[in-house]
Amino acid sequence: MRQIDILIAGGGLAGSTTAAALGRTGHTTVLVDPHVVYPPDFRAEKLDSTQVAVLRKTGVGEAVLRAATLDGESWVARFGRLLEKRPGDQHGILYDTMVNTMRSEIPPSVDIIHAKVMDVATSADRQTVTLSSGEQISARLVVVANGLNVGLRHKLGMARRDISKTHSIMLGFDLVPAGAAFSFPALTYYGEHPSDRTAYITLFPVGAAMRANLCVYRELDDPWMKQFRDSPRETLQALMPGLAKITGAYDVPGRVHIRPADLYVTEGVEKPGVVLIGDAFSTSCPTAGTGTGKVFTDVERLCNVHIPRWLATPGMGAEKIAAFYADRVRAAYHAHSAHKAFLVRSVTIDTGFLWRARRWAAFFKRAGIGMLRELARRAGHSEPSVSTGATQRAFARTSRR
């Protein structure tokens, strides 16, 4: 039986980033995933500056940033009014491109086996891992990074606790101008009314395409979902009638991808020799935009802090594993992610006085910041003025308020 230091179960973003980071440490590492090339998968499609900062702490990821498209500037709008033009900090990249690019960063010292982890027999010293090929490998540590797949966790005696079923739904599609080119580099347009159950649509470049992510709070069997899938342009126009005042006429030329988000956390995780990261431990709401940051935080703390400590001494008991889950940096980000998931939902759809006040406060705050930035641009002549046409008129209406 082959003996190694670390086996990683799952080669999505969490597993591939972990493998790339550990491959530079000298620890004998094996990554197990059935896909030779990671297939198309509608998940995270951009990274913001905070996520990039954590990614860079892992020591890997520069290739991902080179493969991504930086937006340069992002416009913010609501009710058909341009509120703010802020510096862009988001890198657009499709999830499968991100994962496959990260895999290209895995050094040859990491052995990649195209199979599935079927079972893990744990102990306080070494773990016996059984693969779908029948091969068995002995590892000091098993990193479970297999995302939403619960079979292995159930075999390990862990349980999934649901927090919020179908907490939100993300719809992804390309948006193209039906006429003149889009005048904005990137755009976030917020939902117009709580009854629309829509947080926002964000438009951002991925290569030559303008990608759209629409975030809604509905059930999968809501007739509106089928309506959007069948007639996306008309349904989007009815949902956000003011959007075209910013974008101009648009069309949705291709397929609409739909991804519901169930919020859950895995319990009973403090087992010897096995640690969970990313969605294997808990999920996040894509509307809140914290999922990728949570993955990178898990990987950074695990690879930079805990694994070096664990491998420096004999054994791999549950007390070592517990230290990772109790890590203050990691715990703080997980708490932030969970809090933001419910905060954004309440700000979007709750109709109580305090929530209505928060929505309007955010609206006027963005408008005020936008006016100050525009005044600074005009005074310093350091940035271009707002484009002409419908966008110019929308900004002018906002500025007069």
Predicted regions and their residues:
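Conserved N-terminal helical subregion
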Residues: 2, 53, 57, 64-158, ...
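Conserved FAD-binding catalytic core of PHBH/FMO-like flavoproteins
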Residues: 128, 145-245
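Conserved N-terminal glycine-rich FAD pyrophosphate-binding loop of Rossmann-like flavoproteins
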Residues: 36-56
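FAD/FMN-dependent oxidoreductases across multiple families
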Residues: 220-317
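Beta1/beta-strand and adjacent pyrophosphate-binding region of the FAD-binding site
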Residues: 1-14
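C-terminal helical "tail/cap" subdomain of flavin- and related membrane-associated enzymes
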Residues: 304-401
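Glycine-rich FAD pyrophosphate-binding loop
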Residues: 9, 23-43
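Conserved Rossmann-like nucleotide-cofactor binding loop
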Residues: 14, 37, 149
